[in-house]
C-alpha cells in the first residue's frame, strides 16, 4: 500500500523544488532559465538548468553553478539532426543537452542566438546595434558588416584581396587572449543595450597611449577626419554617455582607428612571416577617411595578452602569436633526449652503466682473478714473472717468451712508477739476448721501447690481459684451475635430476615437495610454481623478488635457496628442508605459548627482520604459517613471495615518510597494518605491526582484532580498538600497546628500528648477539616424525622395483611422478611464453655462483665440497643418516614433519 500524498497539480517533467540559483555571473542582467537534461559521454542523464543572458551562459545544478562561459567564447550551438529533442553547446568541450520537446529545443537555440551565443559574427544583445558614424541610426544586422580575416602571403607581396593598412592597436585595448578576431558589433550592442535599459549614464573607458590627448574621431597619428559629435572639453579618458548619445561609443572607438562597426566592410589582417619580428598585426577599415599610421608588430602587441584585459577563452581560434611559439617549440625539438625526457634518459643511462659494469666484472673475474686477490706482501725479484699476450690459449705455454714473438700490434706494456711489486727493468740483471725476468710484448715493432729505460719507466701496466704468477700465488693458481674444472662439471639442472618423495604443502600459487637429488642424495624442499598461473594472477614480480631475496640473503633464521631452474611450464626452487614443521601447527596444538617461549620466538623473528630491513627489504607476510622450526627448535622464515626490495622509508608518503615505500595491498588480512589497508603507503613499520599481531596471538591464542566480518575487523584495526587480556605481564602489555599503534610514526621501531625494540624491558634478559649466533638452546625442541622410505637406485629412473609401505607409495602415486606432473606440454601457449619470457633470468645455481664469484678459499675446501657444495649449514639427522648418498638394503629413514593441511587453516595471503 502506498502512502504517497496525492496532489492535484501534475508532477512536472523536471522534478524538484525551485530554489534560488547562483546567477552572480550575470551581474543583475535579465536572464532566461531553461530546465534541461544533461547527457554525458557515457549516457548518464543529469538534471540541469541553463541560464542565458547578454553576458554569458551558466550551467546550474540546484543552487550551485557548475560552469559559466561568456557568449563570445561559445563556438556553436546546434540542434541534433537525428533527435530534435537534443542540442549541443560547444566551447572548451562539447556538451549535450536534451529538452522536453522539440519546440523547447528550438526556442532555446533561438534565444541563445538572439543573445549572441555561438554567433561567429558577434551579434548579441537582442540584435540591436549602434552606428559607427556618430549618428543615432541603428546599425543593420551583424551579417551586413562582417569582420573578415586576411592572412597575407609569406613573401610579403601585396595581393588584390589584401586591404590597406590601418592605425595600430592602442595599449589600452586588450587583444583577445586566444583569438585575434574582435567582435565590435557585439561589444557595442551590449553596451548600448545596458545603458538604454537602465537609462543611466555610464562612464566609457577610452584607449590611452594615442598621440593626441583628445578622444575625437580624427586620427590619433595626425591623420585627417571629421566628427561633429566629439566633445573636446571632456577629459580624454572618460566620456559621460546616456541612452540618447549612445552613438558616442562607436564614434570614440572609431576615433582610434581600431574598430569600425559601420555598414562598410571591415577586416582584420595578419602578416604571418617566418620571422616573428617581421610579423605585423593590422586592423583595416574601409571608410571615407584615410589613416596613415605605422603597423604594430606582434612582439609589441603581445603585452596586451594578459588576464585582466582578456575578453574570455576561445581555444578553437588560437592567435598567431601562440601558433608561432608552438611552431618554434616543435622545430626546436631534436631527436636526441631533451628537457621533456631528461629524467628518463638519466635513469636509462645509469641502468646501462650498471649493466656494463656487471658485464665487465664477470668478464674480468675469469682472467684477472689472481691479480685482484693478490696479497699485499712484497714480492721478490726472483718471484716476478709477468707474461702479456692477447691470445689467452697460448698464454701459459712458455715461461720466457722472446721479444721478437709475433702477436697483436695493438697490445702495449704500461708500467706504473709507484707499483712496489714490480721492479724497474734497470734494476734487474739484463741481457741483450734474454732476461731471467722478462717483461715482453707480442709486437716485434716495440722491442726498442723495452730497452729504453725512459719509455718503460714512464709507462703503466694494463691489467686487462695481465697474469702475475709468483711462488706465493701457486695455491691460488691451482685453486683457479680446480674452480674451472668444477665449473665445467656443473651442468644445468632439470626436474629429472631430483626424486619426488612427498608433498609437504599446498599454497595459493603452487606446491612444495620433499625431493632428493639423485647424484648427491641431499634432501631439499622444492617449490613448484605454474607459469601460466603466475601470468594470470600477475605474480611475476613477486616470484622474481622471492627468488632474488632467497638467493642473496644469508642469515641463520632465513631459509636458503640452493637451486632455481625452469622448464616450459613450471618454475622450480630448491630450498633448505626444515623438518620441524610450521609454527602455526605447534601453536594450534598448544593453544597458546608460555611467555618465555613466545619471547624466544619473537626475538628470533625480530633478528631476521632487522637483517632484512638493513638490506632495504620488507617482508609483509609475517604469520605463524610462514615460520618453520628446524630440528633444534630455531625458526626459519620462508615464503618471500610478498617481500619488497628497495624500501628505505619507515612509513609511507602520506604519513610524512621519505625515501622508497610501497603501496600494494597485499598480505594476510589478520596481520595487515592500517597503512596498508588505507593505501597511504607503507614501509618498514608495517612489519613491526605484524610482529605485534604475532606476539599477541602466541601469548593469547587469538587475534587481537576479532570481528564478525572482514570490514569490521579493518575498521577496528584502523581505529586501534585493542583489548588487552589481564593475565599478560605488564611488560608484555606495554610492548603490545606500543607495537599495535595505528599511526606508523608513533609505532615502536619507527624512529630507531631494531635498537628501539631490543631495548624494551620485555627483552631485558635476551642476549641478542648470542641469540643470532644460535648459541642459546631453544626452550622447545620439536618432535620429528620418522617415515621410512623405500630403497631406490639414485642413478636410475626406474621406480618399479622399489618396495612400498603404508605411508609412502612412490610407484603408484601420480603426484610424485615427475614425468606425469612436469612433462612438457605440447601446446602453443608454452612456446609463446618462451619467446620473451618474464622468467628468463629465473634459473640460478648456488654452486655456479660460488664458482664465478670465487668464494672458495683453499684447495681443500674445493675438493671437499666438489660434489656436495650446497649442503645445509646446520648439521641435521638427515645429512648424518645419508652421508655420501649411499643406499642400504634396509632403505633410508628420513625425518619429516606432519602435514599442516587441514580444515583449521586460515585463508592465505591476499
Swiss-Prot record:
Q: Which residues carry this modification: Phosphothreonine?
A: 664
**Domain named AGC-kinase C-terminal: residues:** 764-854
- Gly residues bias: start-end ranges: 119-129
- Which residues are ATP-binding? 504-512, 527
Q: What is the lineage of its organism?
A: Eukaryota, Amoebozoa, Evosea, Eumycetozoa, Dictyostelia
> Where are the annotated segments for Disordered?
119-239, 270-295, 391-454, 786-812, 859-910
Q: Which residues form the active site?
A: 621
Q: What reaction(s) does this enzyme catalyze? A: L-seryl-[protein] + ATP = O-phospho-L-seryl-[protein] + ADP + H(+); L-threonyl-[protein] + ATP = O-phospho-L-threonyl-[protein] + ADP + H(+)
Report the source organism: Dictyostelium discoideum (Social amoeba)
| Protein name per its UniProtKB record | Protein kinase 3
Q: Which UniProt keywords apply?
A: ATP-binding, Kinase, Nucleotide-binding, Phosphoprotein, Serine/threonine-protein kinase, Transferase
Cellular component, GO annotation: cytoplasm; nucleus
Which spans of this chain does the record mark as coiled coil?
none
In alphabetical order, the GO MF annotations are: ATP binding; protein serine kinase activity; protein serine/threonine kinase activity
Q: Which PROSITE patterns match?
A: AGC_KINASE_CTER, PROTEIN_KINASE_ATP, PROTEIN_KINASE_DOM, PROTEIN_KINASE_ST
Q: Where is the Protein kinase domain?
A: 498-763
UniProt keyword Nucleotide-binding present:
yes
> What family does this chain come from, according to its entry?
Belongs to the protein kinase superfamily. AGC Ser/Thr protein kinase family.
The record's annotation in InterPro entries points to: AGC-kinase_C, Kinase-like_dom_sf, Prot_kinase_dom, Protein_kinase_ATP_BS, Ser/Thr_kinase_AS, STKc_AGC
Report biased composition (Low complexity) as residue ranges: 130-160, 169-196, 209-220, 227-239, 270-290, 422-450, 788-809, 859-886
Which principal EC class is assigned to this enzyme? transferase
Q: What is its EC number?
A: 2.7.11.1
Amino acid at each position: 500500500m502506498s502512502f504517497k500524498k496525492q496532489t492535484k497539480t501534475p508532477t512536472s517533467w523536471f522534478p524538484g523544488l525551485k530554489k534560488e540559483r547562483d546567477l552572480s555571473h550575470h551581474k543583475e542582467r535579465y536572464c532566461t532559465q531553461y530546465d534541461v537534461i544533461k547527457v554525458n559521454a557515457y549516457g548518464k542523464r543529469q538534471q540541469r538548468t541553463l541560464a542565458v543572458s547578454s553576458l554569458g551562459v551558466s550551467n546550474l545544478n540546484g543552487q550551485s553553478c557548475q560552469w559559466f562561459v561568456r557568449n563570445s567564447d561559445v563556438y556553436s550551438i546546434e540542434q541534433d539532426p537525428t533527435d530534435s529533442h537534443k542540442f549541443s553547446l560547444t566551447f572548451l568541450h562539447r556538451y549535450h543537452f536534451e529538452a522536453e520537446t522539440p519546440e523547447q529545443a528550438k526556442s532555446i537555440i533561438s534565444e541563445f542566438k538572439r543573445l549572441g551565443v555561438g554567433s561567429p559574427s558577434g551579434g548579441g544583445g537582442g540584435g540591436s546595434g549602434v552606428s559607427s558614424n556618430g549618428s543615432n541610426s541603428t546599425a543593420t544586422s551583424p551579417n551586413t558588416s562582417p569582420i573578415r580575416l586576411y592572412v597575407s602571403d609569406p613573401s610579403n607581396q601585396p595581393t588584390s584581396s589584401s586591404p590597406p593598412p590601418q592605425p595600430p592597436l592602442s595599449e589600452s585595448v586588450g587583444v583577445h587572449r586566444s583569438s585575434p578576431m574582435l567582435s565590435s558589433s557585439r561589444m557595442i550592442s551590449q553596451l548600448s543595450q545596458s545603458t538604454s535599459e537602465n537609462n543611466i549614464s555610464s562612464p566609457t573607458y577610452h584607449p590611452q597611449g594615442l598621440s593626441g590627448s583628445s578622444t575625437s574621431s580624427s586620427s590619433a597619428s595626425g591623420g585627417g577626419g571629421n566628427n561633429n559629435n566629439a566633445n573636446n572639453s571632456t577629459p580624454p579618458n572618460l566620456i559621460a554617455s546616456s541612452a540618447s548619445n549612445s552613438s558616442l561609443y562607436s564614434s570614440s572607438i572609431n576615433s582610434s582607428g581600431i574598430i569600425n562597426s559601420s555598414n562598410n566592410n571591415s577586416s582584420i589582417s595578419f602578416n604571418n612571416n617566418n620571422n616573428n619580428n617581421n610579423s605585423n598585426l593590422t586592423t583595416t577599415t574601409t571608410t571615407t577617411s584615410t589613416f596613415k599610421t605605422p603597423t604594430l608588430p606582434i612582439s609589441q602587441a603581445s603585452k596586451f595578452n594578459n588576464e585582466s584585459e582578456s575578453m574570455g577563452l576561445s581555444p578553437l581560434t588560437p592567435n598567431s602569436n601562440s601558433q608561432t611559439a608552438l611552431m618554434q617549440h616543435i622545430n626546436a625539438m631534436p631527436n636526441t633526449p631533451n628537457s621533456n625526457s631528461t629524467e628518463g634518459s638519466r635513469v636509462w643511462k645509469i641502468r646501462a652503466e650498471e649493466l656494463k659494469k656487471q658485464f665487465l666484472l664477470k668478464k674480468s673475474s675469469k682472467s684477472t682473478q689472481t691479480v685482484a686477490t693478490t696479497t699485499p706482501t712484497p714480492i721478490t725479484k726472483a718471484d716476478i714473472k709477468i707474461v702479456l699476450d692477447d691470445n689467452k690459449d697460448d698464454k701459459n705455454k712458455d715461461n720466457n717468451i722472446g721479444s721478437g714473438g709475433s702477436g697483436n700490434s695493438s697490445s702495449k706494456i704500461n708500467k706504473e712508477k709507484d707499483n712496489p711489486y714490480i721492479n724497474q727493468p734497470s734494476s734487474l740483471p739484463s741481457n741483450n739476448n734474454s732476461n731471467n725476468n722478462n717483461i715482453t710484448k707480442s709486437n716485434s715493432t716495440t722491442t726498442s721501447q723495452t730497452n729504453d729505460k725512459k719509455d718503460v719507466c714512464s709507462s703503466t701496466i694494463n691489467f686487462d690481459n695481465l697474469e702475475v704468477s709468483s711462488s706465493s700465488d701457486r695455491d691460488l693458481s691451482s685453486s683457479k684451475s680446480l674452480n674451472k674444472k668444477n665449473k665445467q662439471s656443473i651442468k644445468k639442472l632439470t626436474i629429472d635430476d631430483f626424486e619426488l618423495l612427498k608433498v609437504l604443502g599446498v599454497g595459493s600459487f603452487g606446491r612444495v615437495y620433499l625431493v632428493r637429488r639423485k647424484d648427491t642424495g641431499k634432501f631439499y624442499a622444492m617449490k613448484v610454481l605454474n607459469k601460466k598461473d603466475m601470468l594470470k594472477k600477475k605474480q611475476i614480480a613477486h616470484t622474481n623478488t622471492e627468488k632474488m631475496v632467497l638467493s642473496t640473503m644469508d642469515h641463520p633464521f632465513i631459509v636458503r635457496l640452493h637451486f632455481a631452474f625452469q622448464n616450459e611450464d613450471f618454475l622450480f626452487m630448491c630450498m633448505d628442508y626444515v623438518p620441524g614443521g610450521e609454527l602455526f601447527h605447534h601453536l594450534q596444538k598448544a593453544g597458546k605459548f608460555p611467555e618465555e617461549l613466545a619471547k624466544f620466538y619473537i626475538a628470533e623473528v625480530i633478528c631476521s627482520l632487522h637483517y632484512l630491513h638493513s638490506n632495504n627489504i620488507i617482508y609483509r607476510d609475517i604469520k605463524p604459517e610462514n615460520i618453520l622450526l628446524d630440528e633444534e627448535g630455531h625458526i626459519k622464515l620462508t615464503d618471500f613471495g610478498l617481500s619488497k626490495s628497495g624500501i628505505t622509508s619507515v612509513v609511507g608518503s602520506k604519513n610524512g615518510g621519505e625515501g622508497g615505500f610501497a603501496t600494494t595491498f597485499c598480505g594476510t588480512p589478520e596481520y595487515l597494518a592500517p597503512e596498508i589497508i588505507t593505501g597511504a603507503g607503507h614501509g618498514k613499520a608495517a612489519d613491526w605491526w605484524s610482529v605485534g599481531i604475532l606476539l599477541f596471538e602466541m601469548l593469547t591464542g587469538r587475534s587481537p582484532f576479532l570481528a564478525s566480518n572482514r570490514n569490521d575487523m579493518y575498521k577496528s584495526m584502523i581505529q586501534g580498538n585493542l583489548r588487552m587480556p589481564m593475565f599478560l605481564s605488564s611488560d608484555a602489555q606495554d610492548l603490545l600497546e606500543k607495537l599495535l599503534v595505528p599511526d606508523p610514526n608513533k609505532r615502536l621501531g619507527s624512529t630507531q628500528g631494531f635498537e628501539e625494540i631490543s631495548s624494551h624491558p620485555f627483552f631485558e634478559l635476551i642476549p641478542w648477539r648470542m641469540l643470532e649466533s644460535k648459541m642459546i638452546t631453544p626452550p622447545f625442541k620439536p618432535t620429528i616424525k620418522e617415515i621410512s622410505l623405500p630403497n631406490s637406485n639414485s642413478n636410475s629412473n626406474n621406480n618399479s622395483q622399489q618396495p612400498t609401505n603404508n605411508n609412502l607409495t612412490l610407484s603408484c602415486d601420480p603426484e610424485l611422478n615427475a614425468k606425469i606432473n612436469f612433462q612438457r606440454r605440447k601446446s602453443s601457449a608454452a612456446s609463446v611464453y618462451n619467446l620473451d619470457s618474464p622468467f628468463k633470468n629465473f634459473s640460478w645455481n648456488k654452486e655456479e655462483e660460488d664458482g664465478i664469484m670465487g668464494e672458495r678459499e683453499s684447495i681443500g675446501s674445493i675438493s671437499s665440497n666438489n660434489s656436495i657444495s650446497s649442503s645445509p649449514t646446520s648439521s641435521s639427522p638427515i645429512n648424518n643418516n645419508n652421508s655420501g648418498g649411499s643406499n642400504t638394503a634396509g632403505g633410508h629413514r628420513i625425518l619429516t614433519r606432519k602435514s599442516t593441511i587441514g580444515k583449521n587453516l586460515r585463508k592465505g595471503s591476499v
